[in-house]
């Protein structure tokens, strides 16, 4: 028996010695006020807010890549749409029995107006530079065909004209007019095909990667900000004093681990946010699971083609398709150079990040979310069927899809590019077991000391209002102070007000942001 105990003791020492040594190797590098996990549009937006609201707070940003904005915020990893609900038909679902509900569209439009104000303030204060490096006017067009879809689009247009936010939108079912708006879409099209389109001249194309880089560059000029690149967060633990210890590994230095102790932690790590949230142990994390969906685009840089299309043309999603999969033919602008993208085509990978691990999905499954995830799979057969169909597509299938929007397209002009990964939220539900949540959701601890952003579209375009909501949720007392209220209204002049229905305020805000960002402007007129 003694020999057995001795062997067990020795084995325990052998197994645990490396762990103990690793623990000893950790060093509490510093104590800080705020840790931002992830170097994307969300973390950078929150960081700038906090620097402007509370300049004395120290902030550390931890990013696993060798630069910021390398995952979903990177311009090539997303559609670059300034989501304003001008053309995205999924925000206004059809209702054959009554008026179309535009409430979700209004929510998206109001949110993007906040982003425009946030960016304008940063331009005025030298945080962002050269607005055309990150945002440009590109008309937003909805384009459909067939009796049912054209009737829906007219129905939608009529409903949206009752809102002051959509004045200036044009509707047409005349092929010649639509050809003026988007010539590539019309050339070579069957003249007998019934078509319709709406056009909003004040739409935008946005490079969220460029915004992120500029925001972080500005943050780096402050002495109480530190950026840790090539640093992967390995653990997040609550301390006895309700602070948090964030352990990260230096991927360029033998994965040496360091610890930062922080009063507040934000997990803005895109698809990786779910697994990091689960590491915190907060009960709120138990409500969530995630399902990854990737994307690919066809792209052309042929100048003869690109110069003849200056628009984002969105179609109608297939039944069961997620919002991010609405087909669109887009003008994109990178470093001043326009290109055309078409897609997205959904892909499947078990990775939660483009540069993630194939074990991400399996690693995120827990006792608390396995049943909600199962229920969502069973209840969303159309989505599963759609994804299978997308994954099975070959080059000919993708090109056939392109020709529905660009009939005269030639294969040799286009190449396939892989975009970023998204993780759709799956949330526990008392009635259904689990539901697939579209959009984004802030998850925070009860005491507000840690928060994460889960979900996908519209995402980046509404980073400023989403982070504003986070401030209101986790820094409620601070937001209520005269100092923060005054600064927030300076950053976002419409803070606390809705633009819809307020013509004077809408014109004032849009005129201000358009002139500051160098964008097209349309004065809103009474109905």
Curated annotation (Swiss-Prot):
Q: Which UniProt keywords apply?
A: FAD, Flavoprotein, Oxidoreductase, Tricarboxylic acid cycle
Is-annotated flag, keyword Flavoprotein? yes
Report which superkingdom the organism of origin falls in: Bacteria
Enumerate the GO terms in the molecular function aspect. Answer: 2-hydroxyglutarate dehydrogenase activity; L-malate dehydrogenase (quinone) activity
**Pfam families assigned:** Mqo
Give the UniProt family note: Belongs to the MQO family.
The record's listing under PANTHER family reads:
L-2-HYDROXYGLUTARATE DEHYDROGENASE, MITOCHONDRIAL (PTHR43104:SF2)
Question: What name is this protein filed under?
Answer: Probable malate:quinone oxidoreductase
Query: From what organism does this protein derive?
Result: Pectobacterium carotovorum subsp. carotovorum (strain PC1)
């Amino acid at each position: 028996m003694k020999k057995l105990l001795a062997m067990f003791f020795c084995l325990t020492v052998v197994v645990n010695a490396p762990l103990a040594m690793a623990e000893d190797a950790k060093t509490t590098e510093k104590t800080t006020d705020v840790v931002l996990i992830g170097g994307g549009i969300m973390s950078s937006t929150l960081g700038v807010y906090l620097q402007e609201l509370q300049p004395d707070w120290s902030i550390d940003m931890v990013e696993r890549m060798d630069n910021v904005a390398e995952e979903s915020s990177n311009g090539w990893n997303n559609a670059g749409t300034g989501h304003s609900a001008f053309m995205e038909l999924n925000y206004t679902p059809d209702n054959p029995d009554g008026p179309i509900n535009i409430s979700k569209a209004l929510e998206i439009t109001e949110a993007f107006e906040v982003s425009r104000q946030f960016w304008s303030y940063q331009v005025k204060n030298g945080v962002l530079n050269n607005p055309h490096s990150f945002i440009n006017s590109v008309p937003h067009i909805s384009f459909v065909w067939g009796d049912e879809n054209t009737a829906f689009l007219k129905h939608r247009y009529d409903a949206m004209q009752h809102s002051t936010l959509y004045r200036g939108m044009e509707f047409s079912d005349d092929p010649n007019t639509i050809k003026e708006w988007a010539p590539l879409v019309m050339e070579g099209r069957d003249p007998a095909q019934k078509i319709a389109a709406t056009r909003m001249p004040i739409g935008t194309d946005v490079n969220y990667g460029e915004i992120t880089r500029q925001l972080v560059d500005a943050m780096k000029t402050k002495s109480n900000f530190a950026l840790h690149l090539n640093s992967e967060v390995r653990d997040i633990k609550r301390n006895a004093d309700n602070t948090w210890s964030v352990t990260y590994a230096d991927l360029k230095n033998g994965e040496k681990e360091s610890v930062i102790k922080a009063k507040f932690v934000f997990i803005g790590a895109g698809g990786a946010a779910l697994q990091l949230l689960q590491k915190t142990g907060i009960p709120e994390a138990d409500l969530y699971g995630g399902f990854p969906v990737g994307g690919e685009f066809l792209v052309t840089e042929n100048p003869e083609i690109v110069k003849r299309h200056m628009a984002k043309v969105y179609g109608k999603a297939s039944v069961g398709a997620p919002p991010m999969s609405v087909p669109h033919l887009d003008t994109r602008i990178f470093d001043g150079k326009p290109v055309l993208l078409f897609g997205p085509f959904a892909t499947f990978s078990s990775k939660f990040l483009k540069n993630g691990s194939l074990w991400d999905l399996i690693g995120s499954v827990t006792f608390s979310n396995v049943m909600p995830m199962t229920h969502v799979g069973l209840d969303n057969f159309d989505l599963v069927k759609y994804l299978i169909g997308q994954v099975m597509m070959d080059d000919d299938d993708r090109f056939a899809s392109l020709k529905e929007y660009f009939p005269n397209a030639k294969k040799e002009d286009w190449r396939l590019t892989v975009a970023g990964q998204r993780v759709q939220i799956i949330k526990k539900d008392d009635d259904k077991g689990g539901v697939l949540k579209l959009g984004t959701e802030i998850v925070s601890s009860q005491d507000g000391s840690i928060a994460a952003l889960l979900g996908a579209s519209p995402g980046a375009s509404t980073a400023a209002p989403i982070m504003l909501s986070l401030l209101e949720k986790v820094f409620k007392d601070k937001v209520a102070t005269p100092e923060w209220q005054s600064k927030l209204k300076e950053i976002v002049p419409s803070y606390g007000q809705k633009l819809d229905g307020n013509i004077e305020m809408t014109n004032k805000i849009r005129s201000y942001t358009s002139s500051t960002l160098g964008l097209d402007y349309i004065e809103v007129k009474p109905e």
